[in-house]
Amino acid sequence: MKNRYWFMDLKILGCSAWLFLSSNMAFAQSKASPKDSVKTEKEETKKKEGFEPYEKLLKGAETKQGLLKIHRVKDKIYFEIPNEVLGKDLLIVNKISSVPAPINNAGINKGMNYENKIIRFYKDTTNKKVWVKTFDPQITVNSQDNISASVKDNYGESIVEGFEIKTLGKDSTAVIQVNNVFDGNAKSFNNLFDNIGMGGSVRTKDSYIDEVKAFPNNVVVKSYFSTQISEGKTSAEKADLTVGTTTNIVLLPEPMVGRFSDDRVGYFTTPKMYFTDSQQKVEQRELITRWRLEPKAEDEAKYLRGELVEPKKPIVYYIDPATPKQWQQAIIDGVHDWNKAFEKAGFKNVISAKLPDPNDTEFDVDDVRYSVITYAASSMANAMGPSVVDPRTGEILESDIIWWHNVMTLLQSWMRVQTGMIDPQVRENKFPDDKMANAIRFVSSHEVGHTFGLKHNMGASFAFPVESLRSPEFTEKMGGTAPSIMDYARFNYVAQEGDGVKQITPKIGVYDEFAINWGYRWTGKKTPQEELPITQKWIEKHQGDPLYFYGAQQEETVDPRSQAEDLGDNAMKAGEYGIINLKKTLPNLIEWSTKNGENYNEAKSFYNQVINQWYVYNNHVLANIGGIYLNPTVKGDQQSSYIPVPYETQKEALAFIKKHILTLPEWLFLSPLNQKIRPAKNTPKGLVEQSPYNVFREKQAAILYGLMNDNKLLRILEFEFLNHQKVMTVAELFNDLRGFIFSKSIKKQPLNIAERMTQKNYIDALIIDTQRMYEKTEKGIFSPMPMMCDYACSHTHLDKADERNLEFYFDGMKRLSEVGSAKRAELIKVRAIISKAMNKADNDTQSHYQDMMVRLNKALGNN
């Protein structure tokens, strides 16, 4: 779930040469405030005057010892805060423990971490308060520098809650009543409904604290929050909802040494700002998120000699006991598969996965001491791997994988559509358990990779030549379809019948082993600055090797190498092979999915999946037109940062588009299957059948809108402007499209319904985009915009808005660009063609032309 609050993006600090701003502030306050210093016995006795006696307040209390001492007196919950905890860095971690059906259906489930916040407790006996403060921990300053005083004043702490001190215990420990922050009366510790996007208020009369637990380094509070939401337009259409939550308050460990990120390796990151007297601008960095893996003290010499050693603290994942037994081992195997990669970083036996001990009464899947693969009973078809991160250093403290039960539906769909022609075992509605287990193992490894801090590497699959994906030897040796399991490479749709390919999914590959070594190899250095030259050399060793290329996930595809669901180094060749398989699959669709006496619902869904897969291939190809190879470069690596997709490749892509989607694929939309079924998609209202005519029209229109996309055309103009030799121009693109789409009109030949549809879609795409471009300039349009915009990975917990987006953004005044002129000129040329052809057309074609002329004249203002 995407983070919407700054305190959920809590950032890293820390190394021995630097002091945390926050620590400086705490130190200054403790020295300056006599009320918080050690008191004599007489002073302590006097200090307790004015408070209710400790024994009276807590008479009959159920007490639990831990990080904080917890007292429960009937329905009242008290925290007794040890003096040694005051001023310490604590992290609030909120998770969902249970949900009702409406929230489940929205994709929000047990195990999700929806809110984190760093806090400190401060005791103020003068005002009889315990203040809870938060701060932005990305700021670091050397306490010896003059600027540290200014940093302290300009990056101060903020109060999020104030508790009245009810009494003082032994050693004057403050006792506070905390019900209001856990029962829904206050949002400071747990702001559930805002963070899951529901808004509204907690209905406090129907909300309560269920359980409190204390452990040496954390406390756990379980609550139930109720609310009411509107389901329709009338006041009567309301739904009552109750959500179970677990709040952990965790003592953060001694800060780990961070590691600076590098755009050439895909890790989630957290930002840092370093202030020093010597700098002329603030140093802004990103630190990667990773587990604290260090050799034991007695093994450090062995480790540095290159011997494999076990880490001080291995990583343990617990499998939710609610996981169906037949999938438990596959999920465990997917976790254990990463041990080989960690050996590249010098560590052995790093990871283990197991079921919790049923006799362990302390085990709780919502306790942040445990990393859990949670199994969610839901119709949602997905899996995700978020982590809880130390906001000061990027250290991963705990990870959770949310495994939705219905993810198997997605796997079944992919495998049948993409590989059904080469594997008879994946053709039916239910696969053999061993086939599904292999797919589950693949997904498990991918999601576990995220919990190690790894981001999607969408560019990995581009390293493999398309033809090599048809080789059993190559795919077995190289690990399936990509050198990284963190790509969305999916299943091998390139392989053909008779090729003998068995390894159809990615495995943990060359890039993954490299990334784990780069992120986790221990250097023994004390600061990220010290180890920076070392980590840079590790990357330089493989610079230019496509097996080690990292391609970031893109919101709008600019670099066609880095796409989801694609395979190989040529989308056109891969798409052709994929379509060959789809053409063979389609006639078997009913036989594979429907038994005698059954309705055709499965076949209808299957038909829709085939259409969607065909559309995916066209989209992969589309990205090459106006595409740019974007390389994360550094000085000295001899690479270009921006390379237009080669002219020949763009022409090949346009030819594919003309062949497969600007021409009606009769095999797909005029299939004899339409006598029995229509393509149908799953919706909240159930299975909805669709007209093949409308589906084709919408898919084709989407591709044409993609071709007319302003940013795509502006990228083409950009390289035309820069005088790159042999690049496709906007004029050439329009000439090619017009010559193909209106070829029969130019020859004054009648058009069939599909050809008329294509002309309508083309003109509509031009008109709509042109009208948008010439809309009145709005306030703020002249505000500056960066050429390279920020990228936010949409996958998981540490989406950063300050990472390279790999998207080109252009000034808001697009109406002054050449794109507007080119589109208007194209509309005028199309109108001229139609005008000449109109009087020599048959009735249907003439009606079509008349309609188009009305639209064109209106769009062009009768010019």
Residue ranges: model-predicted function:
Residues 1-32:
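Bacterial Sec-dependent N-terminal signal peptides
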Residues 461-863:
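Conserved catalytic/binding loops enriched for acidic/polar residues
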Residues 329-336, 340, 438, 442, ...:
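Solvent-exposed, polar/charged alpha-helical surfaces in well-ordered, non-transmembrane soluble domains
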Residues 323-327, 331, 433-437, 465:
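Active-site neighborhood of thiol-dependent amide/isopeptide-bond enzymes
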Residues 384, 389, 395-403, 444-452, ...:
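Extended catalytic-interface subdomain
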Residues 336-347, 449-450, 454, 491, ...:
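Sec-exported extracytoplasmic/periplasmic mature domains
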Residues 42, 49, 355-376, 438-495:
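The catalytic-center signature of Zn2+-dependent metalloproteases
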Residues 31-323, 341, 350, 356-409, ...:
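Auxiliary tRNA-acceptor-end handling modules of aminoacyl-tRNA synthetases
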